[in-house]
Swiss-Prot record:
One Gene Ontology molecular-function label: ATP binding
Protein known as: Hydroxyethylthiazole kinase
Gene Ontology biological process terms in this record: thiamine biosynthetic process; thiamine diphosphate biosynthetic process
Cofactor list: Mg(2+)
Originating organism: Bacillus thuringiensis subsp. konkukian (strain 97-27)
Transmembrane segments: none
Pathway(s) of this molecule: Cofactor biosynthesis; thiamine diphosphate biosynthesis; 4-methyl-5-(2-phosphoethyl)-thiazole from 5-(2-hydroxyethyl)-4-methylthiazole: step 1/1
Enzyme class: transferase
Amino-acid positions noted as binding ATP in the UniProt annotation, renumbered to this chain: 121, 167
Domain of life assignment: Bacteria
Protein family: Belongs to the Thz kinase family.
Binding residues annotated for substrate, in chain numbering: 45, 194
């Protein structure tokens, strides 16, 4: 796997304009929708239990994000996820804050037990807590802890029968057999809320058009990281507000050529 190979997935997303069904959190809904539109995908935010199964059945991908967790949304996620499974729609799960509270951890473990996942995406602490491995966590954005990230990712992929994506200073993608590290991105991403949540939805757009989910995830992460680097180069001295606007611009303007030129991936 190389940057030339994965760069083609970006063009495919823009040509296909996939419908990405998001059941996400209230903090990031607008940013997620705008980010997907900028990329070239079609976002829909449908949460009502009366319609989620139908909406999920016609989507290119379904993204479940438990950032602002409520029982009615959990019910909707389960309905949507099972419909997606029945209709061969890939499901992505972002277990935001898993480990922060007992209820949040319970839900983070229940959803993968009930729904077949194409991708699980989180920081190291979240993924570790989903598979009941000890890792430090403080709040929903924590990811710093003691442990081997690659080992946790492989364990999650094996136990959950999915592609595990752990993001941080370096990103890891694995299906338990193939493992790739991506070294793109910028630290200013941590100063804008919702960049991780948007990333999961962007991976959803890539998964909708590329059925090799490892390749799709690596392509999405590399694209996202390169876009962040290009945006930061223009705005980092101004601050996160300017960066957020330019980042949306770069999600629209970053090309497959940029990925070939700036992408940093390593198969391990």
């Amino acid at each position: 796997m190389n940057t030339k190979e994965i760069s083609k997935v970006v063009d495919l997303v823009r040509e296909s304009n996939p419908l990405v069904h998001n059941i996400t959190n209230v903090v990031v809904t607008n940013f997620t929708a705008n980010g997907l539109l900028a990329l070239g995908a079609s976002p829909v935010m449908a949460y009502a239990k009366e319609e989620v199964a139908e909406m999920a059945s016609i989507a290119g991908a379904l993204v479940l994000n438990m950032g602002t967790l409520r029982p009615d949304e959990v019910e909707a996620m389960l309905l949507a996820g099972k419909s997606a499974n029945t209709n061969d729609v890939p499901v992505l799960f972002d277990p935001v804050g898993a480990g922060a509270t007992s209820y949040r951890t319970e839900v983070a473990r229940h959803i993968p037990a009930e729904i077949e996942l194409a991708i699980i995406r989180g920081n190291a602490a979240e993924i570790a807590n989903v598979i009941n491995e000890k890792w430090e966590i403080k709040g929903v954005d924590a990811g710093v802890g003691n442990g081997n990230v690659v080992s946790i990712a492989k364990q999650a992929a094996d136990e959950l029968n999915t592609v595990a994506v752990i993001t941080g200073k370096e990103d890891v993608v694995t299906d338990g057999e193939r493992t790739i590290v991506i070294r793109n991105g910028h630290s200013i991403l941590t100063k804008v809320t919702g960049t991780g949540c948007l990333l999961t939805s962007v991976i959803g757009a890539f998964v909708a058009v590329e059925k090799d989910y490892v390749k799709a995830a690596v392509a999405a992460l590399t694209f996202y990281g390169v876009a962040a680097e290009l945006a930061a180069a223009k705005t980092v001295e101004k601050g996160p507000g300017s960066f957020q606007i330019e980042f949306l611009n770069q999600l629209a303007n970053t090309t497959s050529g940029d990925i070939e030129k700036y992408g940093k991936i390593e198969v391990i």
